[in-house]
């Protein structure tokens, strides 16, 4: 699992060059070292993206204080503009990341097994 601030793949009205630079410089390292999940924030919405030819789950976590509009892009498994937070639980065999809205409702769960 790798955590960062800026997204590598995500819908955002911000400059595309920011993501393109991450795709060029960081994504090859994540693939080389067989990272399972890249988790970030920065754009204040929930997104789960799985790009073609990659086994990496790209996760964007929302913010409890501010939420921004979102729409699906290629590889989107889930997206939501709801404000909230995520909880991650891990054991020897499984990782569960739950995206939770400000009322405490689980909006989406990502599960990775080893």
What are these regions (language model features)?
Residues 47, 51-114:
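Binuclear metal-dependent phosphoesterase catalytic core
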Residues 1-59, 86, 106-109:
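His/acidic metal-ligating clusters that form di-metal
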């Amino acid at each position: 699992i790798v955590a960062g601030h800026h997204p590598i793949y995500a819908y955002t009205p911000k400059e595309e060059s920011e993501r393109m630079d991450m795709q060029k410089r960081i994504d090859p390292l994540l693939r080389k070292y067989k990272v399972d999940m890249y988790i970030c924030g920065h754009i204040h919405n929930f997104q789960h993206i799985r790009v073609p030819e990659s086994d990496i789950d790209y996760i964007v976590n929302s913010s409890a204080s501010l939420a921004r509009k979102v729409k699906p892009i290629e590889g989107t498994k889930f997206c939501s503009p709801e404000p909230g937070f995520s909880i991650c639980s891990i054991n020897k065999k499984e990782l569960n990341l739950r995206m939770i809205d400000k009322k405490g409702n689980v909006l989406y769960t990502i599960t990775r097994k080893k």
